[in-house]
Amino acid sequence: MGVTGFSAFPCCGKNSVNIVERKNDDYHHHHHPLEDNKDEDNEMGTELSSMKPPPKVDPDPVPHLEDMVTELTSTPIPETENPEQQNYRIESIKPYEEELTTTNTFKPRGFNVNSTNKEEEEVVCGHFRSTPVQTSKHLFWSNKLIQASEHSLQTALEKHHKSPGEKKSISIAQVYTECTQRPSSTQVSRTPTPTALGLADLINFASSLAVASSSNMALPNLGTMIKGTSEKAQNTSLDFCQPIQSIKFTQATQITQISSEKQDEPPEVMAHKSWTQETRNVACSYLDINESGLKKATIQGEVKFVQAPATSPELQEDKDDSVPGTKKGTPILLKIHFKLSSPQAPEK
């Protein structure tokens, strides 16, 4: 029907057709890549153009962002931490202040208690040093803490034991062991002298210490109260350890008689002139019954040893009313509780 093959195109040969087709193919093949390349270049250009402005714009916001980051890291965090810490501190300070207030309110109470105890002790000591006189019954009441020393007590014991007319002696430890059953009696402390001492002689010695160490002149003025009375000794008994044990003794205590010339002098002058050789001998030894110039009086009472610390500042000081010539290193405190009464004249 139709003519096929190359003979159908009389105006075109095989070579021409092939060349044309190749040229067209090459043109098309080369043209499309160029267009594609141009399109890609245009796209890349647009992309580059779109990418290039951000670097120009980025330097401005980037410092702001860094500043904001630094501000966020520096300022807001301490602001958020400080209120918490401040609140925590405030909450912790309040109970601490309450504890301080409670402790401060408690300490003055304890101090007040101690001060009241000290005041009570001072009142008690003042009571022990009081020396009222009962003129109606001619009795003298003395309850006083006397400072003696081991040296003065030992010398007094030696002088007393040398005397020929020595009475039956009772050891101090024995006296206090017998008195332990008494509820009001205090526990006996250790005495540095192991030698035995009679109870009456001990009270006699204590009374002589009371006479010698009295700062006021009321105690030596007892000579005026017993002046003109009978010189005979009166036997009296004292229940020393009532009601369990009772010790009966007879003792005449002698008190220095002060002349009327010294009584007329003021107390200040008498206090300076009171320490004569006679009073010193009386203070450091037992009173001799046979000594002239002395009056007799009946003593009634008890003597207790009080244990005190050796480092006490009150004991280390030399007081005006302390016994002169005594050692303050090893003091012995005697709690004297006795009465002195003038012997009554015999009834006619």
Swiss-Prot record:
The UniProt entry's GO biological process terms, in alphabetical order, are:
spermatogenesis
Q: Name one GO cellular component term.
A: perinuclear region of cytoplasm
What positions are modified (Phosphoserine)? S149, S152
Cystine links in this protein are none
Q: Which stretches are tagged as biased composition: Basic and acidic residues?
A: 27-36
Q: In which tissues is it expressed?
A: Abundantly expressed in testes. Expressed in germ cells, but not in Sertoli or Leydig cells of the adult testis. Localized at the acrosomal region of the round and elongated spermatids at stages VIII-X.
Region annotated Disordered sits at 27-61, 308-329
Does Transport show up as a keyword for this record?
no
Q: InterPro entries annotated for this entry?
A: SPATA32
Gene Ontology terms for molecular function: actin binding
Q: PTM Phosphothreonine: at which residues?
A: T330
What keywords are annotated for this sequence in UniProt? Phosphoprotein
User: What quaternary arrangement does the UniProt entry report?
Assistant: Interacts with syntaxin-1 and ACTB.
Protein name listed in UniProt: Spermatogenesis-associated protein 32
Q: What is the lineage of its organism?
A: Eukaryota, Metazoa, Chordata, Craniata, Vertebrata
